[in-house]
Structure formats: C-alpha cells, structure tokens
Amino acid sequence: MRRYLRVVGLCLACGFCSLLYAFSQLAVSLEEGAAVGRRPQAAVASWLADGGRGTGRGAGSAGPGRTGRCKEVSLSYWNPYWMLPSDVCGVNCFWEAAFRYGLKTRPTEKMHLAVVACGDRLEETVTMLKSALIFSIKPLHVHIFAEDQLHDSFKDRLDSWSFLQRFNYSLYPITFPSDSAMEWKKLFKPCASQRLFLPLILKGVDSLLYVDTDVLFLRPVDDIWSLLERFNSTQIAAMAPEHEEPRVGWYNRFARHPYYGRTGVNSGVMLMNMTRMRRKYFKNDMTTARLQWGDILMPLLKKYKLNITWGDQDLLNIMFYHNPESLFVFPCQWNYRPDHCIYGSNCREAEEEGVFILHGNRGVYHDDKQPAFRAMYEALRNCSLEDDSVRSLLKPLELELQKTVHTYCGKTYKIFIKQLAKSIRNRYDTPPKER
C-alpha cells in the first residue's frame, strides 16, 4: 500500500511541476508577442536615425537562426541537465550552437599601399604593383598619386587586372598646400615630398604602407603589414636604417642637420599608423610648443631647406631625431638597396633569410651598373599575373643572376632569390587548405 501511495505522490508532484511549466511558457509567449509587436517600429526608428541607409543587420536583429527568446546569458548559469529555460539561448552549448548559429566572422582586413609616380615612372610603378599582387593574401587597396597626364595610362594598365578580386585602386592628383606648392614641388625630386602629406590627404585611412616606385616585393605585403602589430604605444611609423655600416654611411659623414640614430633612416619603404601620426604632438627645435603633423612640416622646411640634400627623407630624419620613441626600426632586408652590397655584403639579416623587399634606387633597374638588380626588375616586369608564369619565373632568373657574379652584388645573388623561391612555393605550390 505504501508503495502505491509513493507512486501516486510522485505522479502528483510531476503533474504539479508540469502545470507550473505550462503557465511559465504561457507568460513568456505573451511577453514575446508584445515584444514582436514593438520590433518593427524600433527597426524603422533605427533606420530613420541612420539617415535612411540600408546598413544591413542592426543591433536589434536576431541573427541567423536566432529567435526573440535569446538573451546574452551563458548556459553555465542555468541547469544544463534537463533543458534550457525558454528565454535563454545555449550560446555555449555545442548542440544548440551548431544548429542555431553561424560562425561570427570578422571582415577581412584590407591593406593600404601608397605610391607617388611622376615623369617616366609608370612602368616602374606597374611592375612594383605586380610584385605586390603576386604574393599578397589579404585584399589590397592601392592609392596612386600621379601627374594628371599619367592617369589614363594607369587606368588602362590596372583595369586589365580586374579579374583580381582582392585588388582595387584609387588615383589622385599631386596635391600640395596652395600657399607653398612650388617650394614642395622643387624639393629633391618632382613629387617626392607628396608622401609627407599622405596622413593629411587620406584622412579616412588608419594605416598605410608607402613605397617608392623602384621597389619590388619578394614576399607578401601581408608580412610587412603585420609589423604594425609590433608597434608599442608610442610608435607611429617604421623604416629601415639608411646604412648598416657607419664607415660608408652618408648621414653620419656628411649631413648638416639632425638625423635619426647612428646612420639615419631611409624613407623608400615606410609603414605608417596615420591615425597616431595625425594625433601626435611632435617635439621640435623651432618652438617650445609641440606641433602636430600638419603644423610642423612648413616650419621645418623653412629652417632646414638650405641644409638638406635628400628632401623629404631628411625632414623625416629631423622629426624622428627629436621624437625617437615614435619610430619602429625594421631590418635592412625589408628595404634592401645597392648600398647593402656594392661595398661588400653588409645586411646580415638578408644573408640569413634572403631579401624581402628590393629597393633599386640610384636608377639601377635601368643601367648596367648593378646587373643583379636589373635582372630582378626585368624578370618581374616581364612576368604576367598568371600562375604558370610565376611558377616558371625562378629558373631563368637564376641563370641571369649567375651572369652577374663579377660584381659585388652579383656575388651574393642567392640572397636575391632565397625568399622569392620560398614565396612562390608557399603561394602556388601549397594546397589551398594548407595556406
């Protein structure tokens, strides 16, 4: 008899619990019905507040498969052994997450590359861009500042690359402050000082990699772009030293103005956090007050224009001399120039890992003074963006480089192709799932 009474008592208790659960479900459904009735009005108000633009899913949207019952509450707060309350989503529960949620993916970061082209630099610029696109992985937006007569030529060449989905570009005229345009245009080379004004012109761009037209990428742009993550809280830009060996350095022997570090820095490859550059107040030797980027350039030029030789690069050296904490210095292999080999090899990092970015200044791509540099340039200039063309690039190039061993730079030709071979192998010979 007692056994039957226990069974009856257990049944009554279960029935009572079920009744309570049914009432709770009814209350929740009524509350949800009221909330659903309010949601369209809230969505319209949000849309109007945003100016009537279709901005996609708003903050109030439930997302894929997400119902109105969901709250941002961890499953671990609730009893996981039976079932979830009706107003809680199992965000941390694998069986609910697997069916109710898509993975939240961050939009792929876009890299920004800038170049300034004037005169006969069209072909050099196109070759540089080709080298950047061959290996890059993330989307690349190129900002091209060029003389007006070059714009149509750039459009003709670059529009033929429209099949590259991860590449787009913007063309800009050469632009200087109207009250001092002639002074800036005459500084060093035509248009060279344009790079100083990039943080002021590209106000919507957070970070930027500036390169000269005579630069060739031998590994993905992504890799130098990742150096931004290594900046500390005070650093706003990154460059390589002008020289590794002080005995052949220019700044430490001839400069008539302040310069950064032991041998100065070279601005042909310059990585910038432009948001920080625009915000920073720079120490200087013209006034006790610190000046922002847009305010310091002209006073700096007026004070030192009779003492500088390399134009805007000298001005950058002066600025970072007074603000050394703001500069991140990367190794010479990221800006490898003839100076690193014409007096004997003096870039240890390139000897160990190869050249990452080749910088053919001194016009070495177009004369016979440094045939190793010219061979690299011509190989990439003649290479198409087709995969087969890139794969077949290496062997003919190595044969050409072997012909240059009578020169100092040619003697170390293997460092020119060491990283290039690795980049080709990683980009084109690795199965997509392993990249």
From Swiss-Prot:
InterPro entries: Glyco_trans_8 (IPR002495), Glycosyltransferase_8 (IPR051993), Nucleotide-diphossugar_trans (IPR029044). The keyword Membrane applies. GO terms for cellular component: membrane. One of its GO terms (biological process) is O-glycan processing. It comes from Rattus norvegicus. This is Glucoside xylosyltransferase 1. Gene3D superfamilies: Spore Coat Polysaccharide Biosynthesis Protein SpsA, Chain A. The keyword Membrane applies. Pfam families: Glyco_transf_8 (PF01501). It is an enzyme of class 2 (transferase). Its EC number is 2.4.2.42. Induction: By E2F1. Belongs to the glycosyltransferase 8 family. Glycosyltransferase which elongates the O-linked glucose attached to EGF-like repeats in the extracellular domain of Notch proteins by catalyzing the addition of xylose. Keywords: Glycoprotein, Glycosyltransferase, Membrane, Signal-anchor, Transferase, Transmembrane, Transmembrane helix. Glycans are attached at N168, N232. Residues 30-435 are lumenal. It is a single-pass type II membrane protein. It catalyses: 3-O-(beta-D-glucosyl)-L-seryl-[EGF-like domain protein] + UDP-alpha-D-xylose = 3-O-[alpha-D-xylosyl-(1->3)-beta-D-glucosyl]-L-seryl-[EGF-like domain protein] + UDP + H(+). It is found in: Membrane. The chain crosses the membrane at residues 7-29. One of its GO terms (molecular function) is UDP-xylosyltransferase activity. Residues 1-6 are cytoplasmic.
